[in-house]
Amino acid sequence: RLLSRGLGDVYKRQFICGIKGYKLSKTEIKFLRKYKPWGIILFSRNIKTIKQTQLLTKSLKNILQNPTLPILIDEEGGRVSRLRKFIDNSVFTNKYFGDLYKKDKKKFNLYFDVYVKQISYLLRLLGINVNTVPVLDILRKNLHQIVGDRSFSSNKKIVSKIGDICIDKFHKNKIATITKHIPGHGLAKVDSHLKLPIID
């Protein structure tokens, strides 16, 4: 709406946007060339096959004339996975890794290292260079389950520690990260995708 009111210059390159399908439409190409977003985020609706996704990410970089264009994805594992067509990591929720960290830190480090390496390899293969992890929301009782098993723990020290490890491991595997959620889903009583949460 702001862009259509002539404020495009102010917001140019200050935003991330998504696209509609498996390939770019003429309208989307025109929009991207005009407003030059900072990055593009992909969702399940954009991913069909490995080759198709590779062509899509290559097209985005070519159109925006940026070989290092930030191309983002939500690949948390568990119920938030955009790459289900290629991998099944439904078991590997953040809660799974948080519980494992509490029980056996050595096993956690081994499992988490292998997990991050596999996800990073697939992302690089697809031409994706940013994963929107880690989720740093603290799990709280009797609130909306938009977070739930997406949180590492109800213990803020564990969330912080695993968050640091997650960032470090992805960076070592050449994938940038974006922490979330800000200001935080942990205290939300409603799903912010559907309603506006009010946090006291």
Feature-to-residue mapping (PLM):
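Single conserved hydrophobic/aromatic residue that forms the stacking wall/gate
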Residues: 1-11
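Short coil/turn connectors at secondary-structure junctions
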Residues: 12, 37, 66-68, 172-175
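Boundary/entry segment of secreted carbohydrate-active catalytic domains
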Residues: 12-24
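N-terminal glycine-rich anion-binding loops that anchor highly charged ligand groups
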Residues: 24-41
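A general structural detector for well-ordered alpha-helical segments in enzyme core domains, enriched
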Residues: 27-31, 56-60, 119, 162, ...
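Enzymes and membrane/adaptor proteins characterized by extended Gly/Ser/Thr/Asp/Glu-rich
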Residues: 36-158, 181, 186-200
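Phosphate/pyrophosphate-binding betaalpha-module
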Residues: 162, 166-181, 189-192
